């Protein structure tokens, strides 16, 4: 039975769960298990209970990529890493291959007028999801929920882990960089700095701060959440990406679960204390659902292998599923 908010762009309420079990954008295995765990938790059935018809859309062979990653770790040559001024763009070939597969899957979904719910995997997979959504909705705004800005270029990245760089690829900031990995030159790079807003930031590298300021990107840190409250921040973010229409227009949400405080979501790769409460994190997507303008959602960076106790797995996976359900119409009353 259909319940809750209406979706202006998906009145047929058809949805595809795109599985993106990729961990190569960072160095910790286990995050590729996120989609499997969320499905095991009953996510697909609970979405159907909200009135959506669903289908699964696998984007890649999980075992194949895990095998490639393990082979690369055993390699003495560094595998597909690219050296740039002494810093590695780590696993660049695998990131390029995986994100193109995700792009192909999400493109198929959105061109069929189905809502793409993409389950990661690390946040590098957003290179594929956002690029595909922008093909269909070039005026879409992007809300990036994260403790981190993920806008390092391959020149500024301190770690070389490409899950910290997807926004720079989406904006085309690496196109003129010497030695830009060939595997990622397929990325259109057409996201405008005026079409993205961040919520939840609290661990931003110095180079990223400069990029955010130089490009005038709307960035709401936890300071802003504390100062204004989560509802006001969401309203400001929506208006930032659609200023001409007072916040009305298609919006994609790419949600890294580390945006929420690790007290609530502990099993994630780069936890940072002082984040959103679980209720704030859920209210955020409830408000997006209420707007009627949500067109796509990523839920990424759930890593069950990093749990210290079983309850940490349960808390993390249940929270990831709750984010998806609330974005898709679940309400408290």
Curated annotation (Swiss-Prot):
Record's catalysed reaction(s): L-arginine + H2O = urea + L-ornithine
SUPFAM superfamilies: Arginase/deacetylase
Chain sites annotated for binding Mn(2+) 2: 146, 148, 256, 258
Phosphothreonine found at: 77, 270
Cofactor note: Binds 2 manganese ions per subunit.
Keywords: Acetylation, Arginine metabolism, Hydrolase, Manganese, Metal-binding, Phosphoprotein
GO molecular function: arginase activity; manganese ion binding; ornithine carbamoyltransferase inhibitor activity; zinc ion binding
EC number: 3.5.3.1
N-acetylmethionine carried by residues: 1
PROSITE patterns: ARGINASE_1, ARGINASE_2
Similarity annotation: Belongs to the arginase family.
Misc remark: Present with 42800 molecules/cell in log phase SD medium.
UniProt name for this protein: Arginase
Organism: Saccharomyces cerevisiae (strain ATCC 204508 / S288c)
Primary gene name: CAR1
């Amino acid at each position: 039975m259909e319940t809750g908010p209406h979706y202006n762009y998906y009145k047929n309420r058809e949805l595809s769960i795109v599985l993106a079990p990729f961990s190569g954008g960072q160095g910790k295995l286990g995050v590729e298990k996120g989609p499997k765990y969320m499905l095991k938790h009953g996510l697909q059935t609970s979405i159907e209970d909200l009135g959506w018809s669903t289908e699964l859309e696998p984007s890649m062979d999980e075992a194949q990529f895990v095998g490639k990653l393990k082979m690369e770790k055993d390699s003495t040559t560094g595998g597909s890493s690219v050296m740039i001024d002494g810093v590695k763009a780590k696993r660049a070939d695998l990131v390029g291959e995986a994100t193109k597969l995700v792009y192909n899957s999400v493109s198929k979904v959105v061109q069929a007028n189905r809502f793409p719910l993409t389950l990661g995997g690390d946040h590098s997979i957003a290179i594929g999801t956002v690029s595909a959504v922008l093909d269909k909705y070039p005026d879409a705004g992007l809300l990036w929920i994260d403790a981190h800005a993920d806008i390092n270029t391959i020149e500024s990245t301190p770690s070389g882990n490409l899950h910290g760089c997807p926004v720079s690829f989406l904006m085309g900031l690496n196109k003129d960089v010497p030695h830009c990995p060939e595997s990622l030159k397929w990325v259109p790079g057409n996201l405008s700095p005026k079409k993205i807003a961040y919520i939840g930031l609290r661990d931003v590298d110095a180079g990223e701060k400069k990029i955010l300021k130089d490009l005038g990107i709307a960035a709401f840190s936890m300071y802003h959440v504390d100062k204004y409250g989560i509802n006001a921040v969401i309203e400001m973010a929506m208006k930032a990406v659609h200023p001409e229409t007072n916040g009305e227009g298609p919006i994609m949400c790419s949600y890294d679960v580390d945006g929420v405080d690790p007290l609530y979501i502990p099993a994630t790769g780069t936890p940072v204390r002082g984040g959103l409460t679980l209720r704030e994190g859920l209210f955020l997507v409830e408000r997006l659902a209420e707007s009627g303008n949500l067109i796509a959602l990523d839920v990424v960076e759930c890593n069950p292998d990093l749990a210290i106790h079983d309850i940490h797995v349960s808390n993390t996976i249940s929270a990831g599923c709750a984010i998806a359900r609330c974005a898709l119409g679940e309400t408290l009353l």
